[in-house]
UniProtKB/Swiss-Prot annotation:
The lineage of its organism: Eukaryota, Viridiplantae, Streptophyta, Embryophyta, Tracheophyta. Belongs to the cyclotide family. Bracelet subfamily. Residues 59-123 form a propeptide. Expressed in flower, stem, shoot, root, leaf, seed, pod and nodule (at protein level). There is a cross-link at residues 29-58 (Cyclopeptide (Gly-Asn)). The keyword Zinc does not apply. It comes from Clitoria ternatea (Butterfly pea). This is Cliotide T4. Probably participates in a plant defense mechanism. Active against Gram-negative bacteria E.coli ATCC 700926 (MIC=1.0 uM), K.pneumoniae ATTC 13883 (MIC=5.5 uM) and P.aeruginosa ATCC 39018 (MIC=7.5 uM). Has hemolytic and cytotoxic activity.
Length: 123
């Protein structure tokens, strides 16, 4: 009798897992999975950003952009990132069809080199 009660629950979990893994493999326009109305994207660590109050993958945002002003992290050169104040490095996507890059900060190596050079001059 207990197995009859558990069977519908097991079927529900199986169907939910099937849908979840099917959606995870498609990257086109599917959002990363959460809304960013009140809080930022939780999935930012795996490459998601907020656009129109929904979290999308970064390469999807860049591929669908008509201009650089569609998202604050889109760029075509390092100067664009510095001008917008969103970083100092414009990284292009591996896909050649995407004409915009993504801004991020890349300062740690520069600071280490600058500190090393300063140390070697004073000694």
């Amino acid at each position: 009798m207990a197995s009859l009660r558990i069977a519908p629950l097991a079927l529900f979990f199986f169907l939910a897992a099937s849908v979840m893994f099917t959606v995870e493999k498609t990257e086109a326009g599917i959002p990363c999975g959460e809304s960013c109305v009140f809080i930022p994207c939780i999935t930012a660590a795996i490459g998601c950003s907020c656009k129109s109050k929904v979290c999308y993958r970064n390469h999807v945002i860049a591929a669908e952009a008509k201009t650089m002003d569609d998202h604050h992290l889109l760029c075509q050169s390092h100067e664009d990132c510095i001008t917008k104040g969103t970083g100092n490095f414009c990284a292009p996507f591996p896909d050649q069809d995407i004409k915009y890059g993504w801004c991020f900060r890349a300062e740690s190596e520069g600071f280490l080199l600058k500190d090393h050079l300063k140390m070697s001059i004073t000694n």
